[in-house]
Regions:
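Terminal RNA-binding accessory module
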Residues: 364-473, 478-491
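Conserved strand-turn element in the central/C-terminal portion of the radical SAM core barrel
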Residues: 174, 178-185, 249-258, 284-295, ...
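Short flexible coil/turn linkers enriched for glycine and charged/polar residues
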Residues: 157-161, 171-173, 274, 284, ...
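Proteins enriched for Cys/Gly/acidic motifs involved in redox and nucleic-acid/cofactor modification
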Residues: 1-221, 233, 263, 268, ...
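Contiguous mid-protein beta-loop-alpha structural module that forms a pocket-lining wall or clamp
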Residues: 329, 343-346
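Conserved, mostly hydrophobic/aromatic
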Residues: 175, 195, 212, 252, ...
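Intrinsically disordered, low-complexity terminal tails and inter-domain linkers enriched
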Residues: 110-137, 227, 457-487
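Radical SAM/AdoMet-radical enzyme domain recognition
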Residues: 235, 243-244, 249, 261-320
Length: 491
């Protein structure tokens, strides 16, 4: 979600003539879009901005700012220890950033002009003091009606294949460990027509895969829009977006288990453009801890939900989030989580050590867990998850899978990177003509969290039009992938 917010800010600045630069030392505006889910993210952002203090002394005309969740949570206090910070903008004001930047730049130019008319003596001291004698700053963390509809513009790169679409803002769940309801506000949803229009525009510009974003995406519209034919607003949205001509894949993240009703499971089974991947946060396998977290489901209900999702779609990948070391988590509680992870065999999981967030109920709980215990549980669970991930990848070796090529690999630019419908990363030989296209890839080996393969050559070329599933098709006895016989799903 932060990535999508950053795209919106970048688009608004570029629309006014600004350009991206690769080095902070070349910038006229430096903005850090922040996350507050874990304390480490806060500390990283504060440390980064602190390091930029030297640049601020060298280039006093530059605008420095904090955006996003940490800005929302801390507001004006961020100015106290970081005198070079000019701008603090919360989560409902991203669309105001360009205006604020222009206002600050104008004030700085005026200040520079006045300062230049002063005595030319002691220039270095004046540079170091920067604007201490007349400081300009803007802090805006107020709520704004309709802010959910302001994240709607995107600056696409050439041959960009994927895009995020924000469908809602805020969260009403109030999990005891989470600061998001404080930083993102209450649930607010965009209209189906508005979202579908944005998707149509993106697809017309070459995008083939859309990911719908929301804090709890499957609770979209529950306060604004009615059910129709027993279908929730979220399922109605999925069906509307699914109808967009030219769209090849549709994803959504992140859902909450309590929002997975039968209508959504049915949609997974009958909407072929929906990717064969569900990210379903678990958080804990202990009912005691789930209750303390205010998660509103039990481990048993979670397992049953996973089974129903898997029955609805062959080869669907399930990934999850897990927190270890939540206050009061005993060894037995942790063992219950470990046992459940082993039972479900997730395709992948993000495992986090519990991080207290200020002003959350969990942070005030007295039975906090020692850091060394959190770390031991984190490492133990990661080993288990990594083994499950490895097996999931190895099952695809020798198979032919459809991959959406996103571009050069970040770790090896000589190769291209794409994703299967099941969200597996696949690396293959670079051919720039494949960027932004669906390609049939024969998987040759699994390498940790990624797969390696070779594009399949056929009489029609190497682009995919079979609509195969992410679980692949077998290689024929003659050594050629049996790619002509897909699973019958539309691309």
């Amino acid at each position: 979600m932060n990535e999508r917010d950053s795209e919106q800010v970048a688009h608004s600045l570029m629309a006014r003539g600004y350009e991206r630069v690769s080095k902070e030392s070349e910038a006229d505006v430096v903005l850090l879009n922040t996350c507050s889910v874990r304390d480490m993210a806060d500390q990283k952002a504060l440390g980064k901005m602190g390091m930029l203090g030297r640049l601020a002394k060298e280039r006093p005309h530059v605008v420095f700012g904090f955006l996003g969740c940490m800005a929302q949570a801390r507001g004006g206090e961020l100015l106290k220890g970081l005198p070079h910070v000019d701008l603090v903008v919360g989560t409902q004001k991203f669309h105001r950033v360009a205006d604020y930047v222009e206002e600050l730049i104008a004030k700085k130019k005026s200040w520079t002009s006045i300062n230049a008319q002063r005595s030319t003596l002691n220039v270095q001291r004046r540079m170091e003091n920067r604007m201490d004698d007349l400081r300009f700053s803007i802090v805006d963390i107020a709520e704004e009606t309709g802010s959910q509809s302001t994240i709607r513009e995107q600056q696409l790169t050439p041959r960009q294949a994927t895009a995020f679409v924000s469908i809602m803002q805020g969260c009403n769940m109030h999990c005891t460990f989470c600061i998001v309801p404080q930083t993102r506000g209450a649930e607010r949803s965009r209209s189906i027509n508005e979202i579908a229009s944005e998707v149509r525009d993106l697809v017309s510009r070459g995008v083939k895969e859309i990911t719908l974003l929301g804090q709890i995406v499957n609770l979209y519209g529950r306060h604004e829009f009615p059910k129709v034919d027993s279908k929730s607003p979220f399922v109605q949205l999925l069906e509307a977006v699914h109808q967009v001509e030219g769209l090849k894949r549709l994803r959504f993240t992140s859902p909450h288990p309590i929002g997975f009703r039968e209508d959504l499971i049915d949609a997974i089974s009958h909407l072929p453009k929906l990717a064969e991947h569900v990210h379903l946060p678990l958080q804990s396998g202990s009912n005691k801890i789930l209750k303390a977290m205010h998660r509103a489901y039990t481990a048993e209900k979670y397992v049953d939900l996973v089974r129903r999702i898997r029955r609805a779609r062959d080869c669907i990948a399930i990934t999850t989030d897990i927190i270890v070391g939540f206050p009061g988590e005993t060894e037995d509680d942790y063992k219950q989580t470990r046992d459940l992870v082993e039972e479900i065999q997730f395709d992948n999981a993000f495992v986090f050590r519990y991080s207290p967030r200020r002003d959350t109920p969990a942070a005030a709980m007295t039975d906090q867990i020692e850091e060394h215990t959190k770390e031991a549980r984190n490492q133990d669970l990661l080993r288990l998850v990594n083994e499950s991930t490895r097996r999931a990848g190895e099952r695809l070796v020798g198979q032919c899978v459809e991959v959406l090529c996103e571009g050069p690999s970040k770790t090896n630019p000589a190769r291209l990177m794409g994703r299967t419908s099941t969200n597996k990363i696949v690396l293959f030989e670079r051919d720039n003509e494949l960027i932004g296209e669906l390609v049939d890839i024969q998987i040759e080996r699994a390498n940790g969290f990624s797969l390696c393969g070779t594009p399949v050559q056929s009489s029609a070329g190497i682009l995919s039009d079979t609509g195969r599933t992410g679980c692949g098709e077998p290689v024929s006895s003659g050594g050629h992938p049996a790619c002509a016989n897909g699973a019958g799903l539309e691309a």
